[in-house]
Amino acid sequence: MQQEADVNVFQQDLADMKGEHKALEQRVSALERVSDRQDQQIMTLNEKLNKIEENTTWIKRTITGAIITAVSTGIIGGAIAIMYSLLQH
């Protein structure tokens, strides 16, 4: 009789462990899905950051070019004005 009770207890424990195991598998599966979604979001954000970086580089080049053009125009215009005033005298 005692052996049957022990067997029943062991069977109940085994059934409980199987249930807990299934629950843990479901939790792990849910965490994997969340992790996959987060990885995808990170990849999307990295792509957007790369595009922003490319646009920023283009803007910096444009501004640098505009500054160089303005300085060159000022120097050339000043030189022409000086030469013109020298020729007038």
From Swiss-Prot:
InterPro entries per record: Haemolysin_XhlA
GO cellular component, one term: plasma membrane
Domain of life assignment: Bacteria
Membrane topology (UniProt): Single-pass membrane protein
Pfam families associated with the record: XhlA (PF10779)
Compartment list: Cell membrane
Record's keyword terms, sorted: Cell membrane, Membrane, Transmembrane, Transmembrane helix
Disulfide bonds: none
General function of this protein: Associated with cell lysis upon induction of PbsX.
Family the entry assigns: To B.licheniformis xpaF1 and xpaL1.
Protein name: Protein XhlA
Gene expressing this chain: xhlA
